[in-house]
């Protein structure tokens, strides 16, 4: 890769640990049915496309597109969209949604850490709660910079460490620790880490805190949906014995109660994320 060198100030990670984490994550995202949860996040894709100020006819690459929230939003704005993910089942869900909405776009299986596109191929690159989960963070950031045209923009939506989803993953990590040396995905939700990944010599970073609101019938309903359909939570419970599952469930219910602003028995939980626009120099 033309921009794959490690960024200054960021220590290298043990390759064996990154490989183990990547294999674990692939299994997690391939399990359950992420689209059940992912489609509720569609508003984030619409907001990010507006923040990017997309222009009709421009080329857009959606990296780790999942079920296509960003891709569909960009296609609605008459962009030429290529949706990529390394989990084929997720791309199939995105295809189903595009067909239902009668939107034209391209789909390609691809690894965010090794994108199969030439340098400066796209006017825009984006990732919504996707690239932040790559084990080799520097490599994934370098790939986004590489495929985006000079003068183009990269748009990201990343959960923050202190928000609800950031705390969800922190809670899970206490019960199912990641491989040694792995960096938290939620670091992508901090300005300091973004400035390491996208240094000022290559890009300018504008990060705006936003809130996505999870709305469920109750906290128990939310937990049931996430345990059944959201791969990382499903897999976490699957690695624990009955006692461990009970403890984790109790802690997640406590977490939901702490963030819940509803007082009528339902669940209304804001979760902070960073909406990021990166201008490629």
Regions found by a protein language model. Name each.
Residues 5-55, 69, 93, 223, ...:
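Conserved class I S-adenosyl-L-methionine
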Residues 138-139, 145, 149-218, 233:
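Conserved catalytic/acceptor-binding region of the Class I
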Residues 123-137:
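A short SAM/SAH-binding and catalytic strip from SAM-dependent methyltransferases
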Residues 113-124:
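A short acidic, Gly/Pro-enriched loop at the edge of an enzyme's catalytic core
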Residues 59-114, 139:
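Class I SAM-dependent methyltransferase SAM/SAH-binding core
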Residues 186-281:
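Conserved Class I S-adenosyl-L-methionine
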């Amino acid at each position: 890769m033309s921009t794959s060198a490690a960024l200054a100030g960021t220590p290298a990670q043990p390759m064996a640990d990154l490989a183990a984490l990547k294999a674990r994550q692939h299994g997690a995202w391939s399990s359950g049915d992420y689209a059940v949860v992912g489609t509720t996040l569609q508003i984030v894709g619409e907001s990010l496309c507006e923040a990017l100020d997309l222009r009709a006819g421009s080329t857009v690459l959606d990296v780790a597109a999942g079920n296509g929230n960003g891709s569909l939003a960009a296609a609605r704005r008459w962009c030429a969209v290529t949706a990529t993910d390394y989990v084929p089942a997720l791309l199939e869900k995105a295809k189903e949604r595009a067909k239902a909405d009668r939107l034209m776009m391209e789909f390609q299986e691809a690894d965010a850490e090794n994108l199969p596109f030439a340098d400066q191929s796209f006017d825009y690159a984006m990732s919504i709660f996707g690239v932040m989960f790559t084990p080799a963070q520097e490599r994934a950031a370098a790939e986004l910079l590489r495929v985006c045209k000079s003068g183009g923009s990269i748009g990201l939506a990343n959960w923050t460490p202190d928000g609800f989803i950031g705390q969800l993953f922190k809670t899970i990590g206490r019960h199912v620790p990641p491989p040694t040396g792995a960096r938290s995905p939620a670091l992508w939700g901090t300005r300091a880490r973004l400035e390491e990944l996208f240094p000022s010599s290559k890009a300018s970073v504008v990060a705006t805190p936003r809130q996505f609101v999870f709305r469920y019938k109750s906290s128990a309903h939310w937990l049931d949906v996430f345990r059944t359909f959201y791969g990382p939570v499903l897999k976490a419970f699957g690695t624990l014995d009955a006692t461990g599952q009970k403890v984790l469930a109790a802690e997640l219910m406590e977490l939901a109660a702490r963030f819940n602003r509803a007082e009528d028995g339902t669940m209304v939980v804001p979760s902070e994320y960073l909406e990021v626009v990166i201008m490629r120099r």
